[in-house]
Swiss-Prot record:
Gene Ontology MF term list: lactoperoxidase activity; metal ion binding
Function description: Removal of H(2)O(2), oxidation of toxic reductants, biosynthesis and degradation of lignin, suberization, auxin catabolism, response to environmental stresses such as wounding, pathogen attack and oxidative stress. These functions might be dependent on each isozyme/isoform in each plant tissue.
Protein name: Peroxidase 3
Organism for this UniProt entry: Betula pendula
Family: Belongs to the peroxidase family. Classical plant (class III) peroxidase subfamily.
Cofactor(s) required, per the database record: Ca(2+); heme b
Catalysed reaction, written as an equation: 2 a phenolic donor + H2O2 = 2 a phenolic radical donor + 2 H2O
Amino acid sequence: NLAPLDLQTPTAFDNNYYK
């Protein structure tokens, strides 16, 4: 879930995931 999503959207996902 995190791997494929991070690859497609490392910016928006990363921001939301980290926060």
